[in-house]
Amino acid sequence: KYKESQDERFGIIEEAMTEYPADGFELQLNHMPYFFHPNEIGEGRSIMTDWIGRVHEVVKRNGKDKELAIRLPDRIEDCMNAGLDPETWVKQGIVDVFIPEMFNENARVKISADYSEYTNLVRGTDSRVLGTVNSSIQTDRLSEAPISMIRASAMNACDQGVDGLYVSEWFQLWPY
């Protein structure tokens, strides 16, 4: 099911991994994560898992040190409801790096982000978790967070045992 769409997206990834020097590949699955009709979510998880497996295979074919990183909703329940199954991906060893972000709100600072679902999920495996460090707060007074808020967000992630930090959605702060 949905073979044509899968193959089209996979072809782009395969070209990027085989024709260009790359350290790996990152999938952004958190922006509008609506991949399947609500009646097809269960079947969709299996479809997406098979596709993620194909992507992982092409990434590793270009070097065992190459990694597949996936940005996805920060709650596993939200992933499951979108047709994404990180629990199975960890069991199958097909995702190297998980980057949990607030569901559909990945640009906003989330000082109280909870990474425990993912750090517990990957414990004892080869998969890793990166905490996201964002800059946007979009209030009526401020667009971007002050440095103290950004540092608090980073320290919260580190205190929870993430394996590293991922600077996400800093478009307006060039040169960062």
Briefly describe each language-model feature range.
Residues 1-176:
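Glycan-processing catalytic domains of CAZymes
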